[in-house]
């Protein structure tokens, strides 16, 4: 979990994803997540996906209890809301629904130490694990109070997009994979995941605007990787 004493106290995440074809993207997300709560917006139990115009910027905002207080604390820690990092904070605008659950999101950063300083030092997330990948790359696993934030960090990420993808949790990946295929979404076969006790499949639809994974965890463990 995140540091409960941290005055920022990040929890859920709100993702603004630019897409080229709003109609096709809306259809794909309706199949994947169900009916939107408003035009182009889907609410999960621990996050929100908002479709944006193709020329809009990607937005990543972590949910906090008090946005003004969190912004003031972030500024005190040296992170300006108008700085180069396109990550911010927002308040929860509606009750959390019973619905889809985010397992984790994937972000990238050009430098391991700077990533730790940003997510742990400034946003107050708990760094749970560091996994070397070779070639000066590492996976950093942070926790908020409601989800895992995976950051792939190293020099090779300098030219990569900040947002690397999203993973949705499912209780029955075989049934979910079959449902998506029957509904017309290009979805891979189910395979064993990297984390012990997990099985995954990839939803290979570019109209989703980001790499998308389904993950089944059995049993659920505290290991964030």
Predicted regions and their residues:
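Eukaryotic phosphotyrosine signaling hubs
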Residues: 12-13, 56-60, 163-164
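DNA polymerase sliding clamps and clamp-related checkpoint/processivity subunits
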Residues: 47-56, 60, 64, 83, ...
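Vicinal oxygen chelate
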Residues: 1-9, 17, 68-104, 134-150, ...
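Core segments of cupin and vicinal oxygen chelate
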Residues: 1-49, 53, 72, 77, ...
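Intrinsically disordered, low-complexity segments enriched in Gly and acidic/Ser/Thr residues
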Residues: 143-145, 149-183
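Short proline/glycine-enriched turn/loop motifs at strand-loop junctions of beta-rich domains
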Residues: 22, 67, 170-174
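Short hydrophobic/aromatic beta-strand micro-patches
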Residues: 18, 61-65, 108, 167-169
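A short, sequence-level motif marking secondary-structure junctions
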Residues: 53-56, 154-158, 217-220
């Amino acid at each position: 979990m995140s540091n409960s004493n941290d005055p920022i106290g990040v929890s859920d995440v709100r993702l603004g994803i630019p897409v080229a074809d709003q109609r096709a993207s809306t259809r794909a997300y309706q199949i994947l997540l169900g009916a939107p709560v408003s035009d182009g917006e889907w609410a999960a139990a621990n996050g929100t996906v908002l479709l944006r115009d193709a020329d809009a910027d990607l937005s990543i905002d972590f949910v906090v209890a008090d946005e003004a207080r969190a912004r003031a604390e972030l500024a005190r820690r040296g992170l300006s809301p108008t700085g180069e990092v396109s990550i911010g904070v927002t308040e929860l605008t509606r009750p959390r629904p019973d619905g889809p659950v985010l397992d984790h999101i994937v972000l990238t950063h050009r430098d391991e130490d700077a990533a730790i300083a940003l997510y742990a030092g400034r946003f107050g997330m708990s760094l749970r694990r560091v996994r070397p990948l070779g070639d000066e790359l590492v996976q950093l696993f942070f926790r908020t109070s409601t989800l895992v934030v995976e950051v792939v960090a190293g020099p090779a990420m300098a030219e990569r997009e900040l947002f690397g993808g999203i993973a949705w949790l499912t209780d029955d990946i075989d049934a979910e994979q079959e449902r998506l295929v029957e509904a017309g979404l290009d979805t891979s076969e189910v395979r064993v995941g990297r984390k012990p006790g997990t099985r995954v499949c990839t939803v290979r639809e570019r109209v989703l605007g980001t790499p998308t994974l389904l993950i089944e965890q059995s049993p659920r463990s505290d290991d964030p990787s």
